[in-house]
Amino acid sequence: MAAKIRREDEVIVLTGKDKGKRGKVTQVLIAKGKVIVEGINQVKKHQKPVPALGQAGGIVTKEAPIDVSNVALFNSATGKADRVGFRIEDGKKVRFFKSTGELVK
């Protein structure tokens, strides 16, 4: 099955502490149905030092995965979150915005 949200897409968070925020998808975890969005859903992780690798210990801030159902693709034409559909054009499967019918770039 084709993914409606892909890496490098700009998305808006629909629910949770970061509701309404926009960011770029950096990673899609297909098996878990989650995405990692740049600058969104940041958590603090306590990390032990690893002297063999030269890593210092401390508290590290990183992005945690968000369920794909809690984000929507950002439509720059309308300035809002939008749903995505698929259709066949010239023998290729392409994504389009359901509200405007425009192709997703």
Swiss-Prot record:
Organism: Aeromonas hydrophila subsp. hydrophila (strain ATCC 7966 / DSM 30187 / BCRC 13018 / CCUG 14551 / JCM 1027 / KCTC 2358 / NCIMB 9240 / NCTC 8049)
Phosphoprotein listed as a keyword: no
HAMAP family recorded: Ribosomal_uL24_B (MF_01326_B)
InterPro entries in alphabetical order: KOW, Rib_uL2_dom2, Ribosomal_uL24, Ribosomal_uL24_CS, Ribosomal_uL24_KOW, Translation_prot_SH3-like_sf
A Gene Ontology cellular-component term: ribonucleoprotein complex
Gene Ontology molecular functions: rRNA binding; structural constituent of ribosome
Function text: One of two assembly initiator proteins, it binds directly to the 5'-end of the 23S rRNA, where it nucleates assembly of the 50S subunit.
Recorded family membership: Belongs to the universal ribosomal protein uL24 family.
Keyword line: Ribonucleoprotein, Ribosomal protein, RNA-binding, rRNA-binding
GO biological process: translation
Protein's UniProt keywords contain DNA damage: no
Assembly: Part of the 50S ribosomal subunit.
Protein name per Swiss-Prot or TrEMBL: Large ribosomal subunit protein uL24
